[in-house]
């Protein structure tokens, strides 16, 4: 089935149909196979792509750059310290300048309104590499990864996101599950559940696709029978360590442990994480946390036992960022 996604933005997946999302996933699968077999054909020769990063990144930057190079495109990396964006020049003006020079723009930053403004004024496709509200390229990678690790049709796959569900991962996993007719469960304390407006929108999508949506504080209910357990960091890197105590106490019952995974009752259950993950105290941040909260020395949102077990497929997710991002660029620019 063919879809024309030429010159389409990727801002949140709200405005993509289920069929368009599945087309991108199938294209990513084909591009991945071509890369593995050495038969990939560069379809973006002569294209120039600007990568705006107001937030630092490993996976997103590398995925966009390698995907672009594989397809013959050129990229320019722009960070806050090497441009006038937001200092002497508005995003609206930046969009109108870069749109004259580049064939597409990627943005990774804070507010969803900023990437929407870029899309409104650039005159070229804009791709959301992450905002506080949504993380669409991660969602495509997550679903591709779940497809690879399950022999079920999408509509039969059951997954749970557990932890702080107010963030871009909680929002986006709820959205794409609703769009694709999946069984999606969001498990978080009441204060950290997705906004009611987003939930209502996803419930409407679910009525059209047959998705099953569960939003609950009950860990037992949420994990029963799931195929995949997703989580993310509990505290943003910008927040001072002193403020972590209340959040940690609130989320400790939602830590992904071997016992939690076993409560799924599924011997094939897999663990997923968009990374980076605080699963030990080997990083600078991990050491500081372990000093202040010794009971978390073996992991914060996920324990070392789960992360280093065969259940963990987070590195497959990380690789699939590249393949799905490549699919987005090829579909929009080729």
Swiss-Prot record:
GO molecular function terms attached to this record: amino acid binding; ornithine carbamoyltransferase activity
Database matches in InterPro entries: Asp/Orn_carbamoyltranf_P-bd, Asp/Orn_carbamoylTrfase, Asp/Orn_carbamoylTrfase_sf, Asp_carbamoyltransf_Asp/Orn-bd, Orn/put_carbamltrans, OTCase_ArgI
PROSITE patterns the UniProt entry points to: CARBAMOYLTRANSFERASE
Residues annotated for carbamoyl phosphate binding in this entry: 57-60, 84, 108, 135-138, 274-275, 321
Binding site for L-ornithine: 168, 232, 236-237
Superkingdom, natural source: Bacteria
Keywords associated with the record: Arginine metabolism, Cytoplasm, Transferase
Location of this chain's protein in the cell: Cytoplasm
Database matches in Gene3D superfamilies: Aspartate/ornithine carbamoyltransferase
Any single GO BP term: citrulline biosynthetic process
Gene Ontology cellular component annotations, sorted alphabetically: cytoplasm
Function (record text): Reversibly catalyzes the transfer of the carbamoyl group from carbamoyl phosphate (CP) to the N(epsilon) atom of ornithine (ORN) to produce L-citrulline.
Protein name: Ornithine carbamoyltransferase, catabolic
Organism: Avibacterium paragallinarum
Taxonomy of the source species: Bacteria, Pseudomonadati, Pseudomonadota, Gammaproteobacteria, Pasteurellales
Encoding gene per record: arcB
């Amino acid at each position: 089935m063919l879809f024309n996604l030429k010159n389409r933005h990727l801002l949140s997946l709200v405005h993509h149909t289920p069929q368009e999302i599945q087309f991108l996933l199938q294209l990513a699968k084909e591009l991945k196979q071509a890369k593995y077999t050495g038969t990939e054909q560069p379809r973006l020769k002569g294209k120039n792509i600007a990568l705006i990063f107001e937030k630092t990144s490993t996976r997103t930057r590398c995925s966009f750059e390698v995907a672009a190079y594989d397809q013959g495109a050129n990229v320019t990396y722009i960070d806050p310290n090497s441009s006038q964006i937001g200092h002497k020049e508005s995003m609206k003006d930046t969009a109108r300048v870069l749109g004259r020079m580049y064939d597409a723009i990627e943005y990774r930053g804070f507010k969803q309104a900023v990437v929407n403004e870029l899309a409104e004024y650039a005159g070229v496709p804009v791709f959301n590499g992450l905002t506080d509200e949504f993380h669409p390229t991660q969602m495509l990678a997550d679903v591709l990864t779940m497809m690879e690790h399950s022999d079920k049709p999408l509509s039969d796959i059951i997954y749970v996101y557990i932890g702080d569900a107010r963030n871009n991962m909680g929002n986006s996993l709820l959205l794409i599950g609703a769009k694709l007719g999946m069984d999606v469960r969001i498990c978080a304390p009441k204060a950290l559940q997705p906004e009611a407006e987003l939930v209502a929108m996803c419930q409407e999508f679910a009525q059209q696709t047959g998705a099953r949506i569960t939003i609950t504080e009950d860990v037992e209910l949420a994990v029963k029978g799931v195929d995949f357990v997703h989580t993310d960091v509990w505290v943003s890197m910008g927040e001072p360590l002193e403020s972590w105590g209340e959040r940690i106490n609130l989320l400790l019952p939602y830590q992904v442990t071997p016992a939690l995974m076993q409560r799924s009752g599924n011997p094939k259950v897999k663990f997923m994480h968009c990374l980076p993950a605080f699963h030990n105290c080997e990083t600078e941040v991990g050491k500081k946390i372990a000093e202040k909260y010794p009971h978390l020395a073996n992991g914060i949102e996920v324990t070392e036992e789960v992360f280093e077990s065969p259940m963990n497929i987070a590195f497959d997710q990380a690789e699939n960022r590249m393949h799905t991002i490549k699919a987005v660029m090829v579909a929009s620019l080729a």
